Swiss-Prot record:
Transmembrane segments: none annotated. It comes from Escherichia coli (strain K12). This is Phosphonates import ATP-binding protein PhnC. GO terms for molecular function: ABC-type phosphonate transporter activity; ATP binding; ATP hydrolysis activity. It holds the Pfam family ABC_tran. The keyword Transcription does not apply. Keywords: ATP-binding, Cell inner membrane, Cell membrane, Membrane, Nucleotide-binding, Phosphonate transport, Translocase, Transport. SMART domains: AAA (SM00382). It is found in: Cell inner membrane.
Amino acid sequence: MQTIIRVEKLAKTFNQHQALHAVDLNIHHGEMVALLGPSGSGKSTLLRHLSGLITGDKSVGSHIELLGRTVQREGRLARDIRKSRAHTGYIFQQFNLVNRLSVLENVLIGALGSTPFWRTCFSWFTGEQKQRALQALTRVGMVHFAHQRVSTLSGGQQQRVAIARALMQQAKVILADEPIASLDPESARIVMDTLRDINQNDGITVVVTLHQVDYALRYCERIVALRQGHVFYDGSSQQFDNERFDHLYRSINRVEENAKAA
């Protein structure tokens, strides 16, 4: 099975606090993987490293590879990092859309990397690009909102627009950081259904950070759980039982309670 993401000996320190400890991870083509863990476990930090949004410590031997290209090595971004990012869709918890633009215009932003610079200066997109953007919106059930400002949409609708933008980008990997954290249950279900549909029918690899264990178990065949910056569990979601759940979350809660009591 083809390895799409390879992480070796990744460490990260923030203000003398080590957020990641020599993390090793391989993710294969077509997988839908949930990164789980309590707040502060390092899951979002790990996800940001995968696309080079942040760099790791200058650790000997640390290396991240995405789609066969080096993203960063020993704390330094690769010179051709843009080539890796060109095929990586990143979905943020807070949507990261341009409120003053329409839904369609926001989706077209996904084509900027493949559009000549002079065209991007004037937002001149081709008819073919606009058609692809409409197809992406149809895919996520948002085509009827194409000419509406994104500022008028609900959180769940905005998240689906962000997914359509990743499709417009022709992403081979989607990295989603807490995409349902601020959504109501029905909106969260629709967003996760959309990500799973893209994964299963398009073969796009999806890595998603989640707080909600039930969604991870329902939508992702594989779980990578982090605890205090270490990989605590990496395996089938079916094998992530109550005992592992308790050890991952409740032991952390006890540490926090003891710290408050002290």
